[in-house]
Amino acid sequence: MKIILWAVLIIFLIGLLVVTGVFKMIF
């Protein structure tokens, strides 16, 4: 169960980094 929570957290953080990178590229 804990592994699933860590996986979700890592995916969320990577997604956040990707969104931030896209924002910096556009603006």
Curated annotation (Swiss-Prot):
Segments traversing the membrane: 3-23
Outcome following mutation: residue 2 to G: Protein mostly C-terminus inside. Both orientations found
Effect ascribed to mutating residue 24 to G: Protein mostly C-terminus outside. Both orientations found
Record's subcellular location: Cell inner membrane
Up-regulation conditions: Expressed in exponential phase, strongly induced in stationary phase and in minimal glucose or glycerol medium, in low oxygen, by SDS/EDTA (envelope stress) and by H(2)O(2) (at protein level).
UniProt main location, coarse: membrane
Gene Ontology CC: plasma membrane
Record keywords: Cell inner membrane, Cell membrane, Membrane, Stress response, Transmembrane, Transmembrane helix
NCBIfam families named in the record: PRK14762.1
Name the UniProt record assigns to this protein: Uncharacterized membrane protein YohP
Source organism of this protein record: Escherichia coli (strain K12)
Species lineage: Bacteria, Pseudomonadati, Pseudomonadota, Gammaproteobacteria, Enterobacterales
